[in-house]
C-alpha cells in the first residue's frame, strides 16, 4: 500500500511486488477489498486482530485511507502456488495480509502484524515468510530499527511464531489482554533477515509470471 521513507512522501511499496518461495506480497488495492471484507466477517479473525466489523463501504473507505497514509505499509499475501497458475485471478490467490504501522514520533519503530485469513493457507509457513520478508523490507527501505507486535494472550500460534523470530515480551496490557513483543534490528539481525530472504525477488506491480509453455510473440 503506501509507506513513505521517513516522511519523504514517496510511497515506497505502492507498486512493489515481493515474490518469495511460498508467498507473494502485493500492494492492497481496491479490487482486493471484497475478499478482505469476506474474511473480516469471521468472529475469530476479528478477535485475533482486535478489529471491528465494518460494512463493505467502510472497508473501501479504510483501504483508500490506508493507501494515502504514508505511515502505513500493507501487503496482501498471495498463495504463490495459485499465483503461478495463469487461470487463477489475483483474488483467487489471496491468503492474508501483513502490515507495518510507523510511529509518528519515532519513524524507525514500527508495529508489525500478520494475518493468514484463508484456513487452507494456514500451517504452511506463509505467516513466517511474510513476516521475514516484511521485516527485511522495512529494515532496508524504511530504516526500521525496532519492531513491535501486539498479540492477544490467547493467540498461542502467533505468540509462538513471533518468539521463534526472536521477539521478546516487554509489557502486558490487562485492558486489552495482550502482550507487546519487541525485536531490535541489530546488525546481526539485519544480516540474518537478509540471508533468510535472499530468495525474494522484486517486481513492479502489476506482474504475473509468463506462461513458459506459450510461444513468445
Which residue ranges define each predicted feature?
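Active-site acidic-Proline motif in GNAT/NAT acetyltransferases
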Residues: 118-124, 153-154
Amino acid at each position: 500500500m503506501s509507506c513513505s521513507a521517513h516522511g519523504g512522501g514517496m510511497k515506497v511499496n505502492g507498486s512493489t511486488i515481493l515474490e518469495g518461495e511460498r508467498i507473494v506480497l502485493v500492494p492492497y488495492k481496491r479490487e482486493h477489498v471484497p475478499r478482505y471484507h469476506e474474511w473480516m466477517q469471521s468472529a475469530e479473525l476479528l478477535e485475533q486482530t482486535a478489529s471491528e466489523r465494518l460494512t463493505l463501504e467502510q472497508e473501501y473507505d479504510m483501504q483508500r485511507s490506508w493507501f494515502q497514509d504514508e505511515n502505513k505499509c500493507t501487503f496482501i499475501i498471495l498463495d504463490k502456488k495459485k499465483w503461478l497458475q495463469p487461470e487463477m485471478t489475483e483474488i483467487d490467490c489471496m491468503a492474508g495480509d501483513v502490515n507495518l504501522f510507523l510511529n509518528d514520533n519515532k519513524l524507525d519503530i514500527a508495529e508489525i502484524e500478520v494475518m493468514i485469513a484463508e484456513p487452507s493457507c494456514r500451517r504452511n509457513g506463509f505467516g513466517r515468510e511474510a513476516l521475514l520478508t516484511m521485516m527485511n523490507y522495512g529494515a532496508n527501505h524504511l530504516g526500521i530499527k525496532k519492531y513491535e507486535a501486539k498479540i492477544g494472550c490467547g493467540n498461542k500460534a502467533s505468540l509462538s511464531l513471533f518468539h521463534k523470530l526472536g521477539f521478546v515480551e516487554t509489557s502486558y496490557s490487562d485492558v486489552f489482554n495482550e502482550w507487546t513483543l519487541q525485536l531490535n534490528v541489530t546488525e546481526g539481525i539485519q544480516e540474518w533477515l537478509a540471508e533468510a530472504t535472499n530468495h525474494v525477488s522484486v517486481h513492479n506491480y502489476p506482474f504475473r509470471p509468463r506462461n513458459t509453455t506459450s510461444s513468445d510473440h
